[in-house]
Amino acid sequence: VEWSTFLLLLISAYILFTCAKNVRQVRLRIIYYALSGFSFVIGMEEMSWGQMIFNWKTPSQLALINDQGETNLHNIRLISDHSDLVYGLILALIILVTLAANRLTKRIKDKNFYTPLLNLAPSKMLLIYFIPASLFSLCLYFNIHEYTHGFIFRGEEELMEMVGAFGLLGYSTSMISRLKNMQQN
C-alpha cells in the first residue's frame, strides 16, 4: 500500500507540475507549482526520502525522536501525534471547496477571485475518495477505531493515505484535461 501511495503521489506531482508549466495565469501557475511540490514532498515522506528503497541507516538523533526510526518528518512524535488530524482537516477543506465552489462564485463579484476558484475546484466525483479518507483520518485522531468501536480495521492509516492519493491523482488528471480543453477552445 505504501508503494502504491508513493507512486500515486509522484505521478500526481508530475502531472501538477505539467499543469503549472502549461497554464497562462500566474496565480494558477503558482498554485499548481505549490500543489506539485506538496505532492512530491508527501510522496517522498511516504518512502522516508528514499530510505525504504536504498536501506540507509537513520541518523541517530532522528531515530531517537522518530516513532518508527525512519528518515522522515511525519513520524517525529510531535508531528506524528497530530498528522491524522491535519490530514483529515486538509481533506475536509478540499471537500468544503468542492461542495461550495459554485455557491461562493455566485456570491463573490470579484472575477479575479472566483475564476481561479472555479478552475481549481475538484470535481464532485472525487468526493468518493476524499470523504472516506477524511472520515477515517479523523476517526483515528479522535480514537474511534477498532479497539473502541469496532468498525475500522488494522492498517487503516496506510489505506486511508492511498485512498487520498487516488483522489489526488484523479484531481491532477482532471486538471490537466481541463487545461488541454481550455487551450483547444
Question: Where in the sequence are the language-model features?
Answer:
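Transmembrane alpha-helix/helix-exit interface in multi-pass inner-membrane proteins
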Residues: 40-60
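Juxtamembrane "helix-exit" motif on the non-cytosolic side of transmembrane helices
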Residues: 104-106, 138-151
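Aromatic-anchored segments of alpha-helical transmembrane domains
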Residues: 38-45, 132-143
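Juxtamembrane membrane-water interface segments that cap and precede transmembrane helices
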Residues: 65-81
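Hydrophobic cores of alpha-helical transmembrane segments in multi-pass inner/ER membrane proteins
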Residues: 4-18, 89-101, 160-179
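Membrane-interface helix-boundary motifs at transmembrane edges
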Residues: 18-30, 107-120
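Membrane-interfacial loop-to-transmembrane alpha-helix junctions, especially the N-terminal start
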Residues: 26-35, 121-130, 184
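Non-cytosolic membrane-interface motifs at loop->transmembrane helix junctions
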Residues: 1-3, 149-161
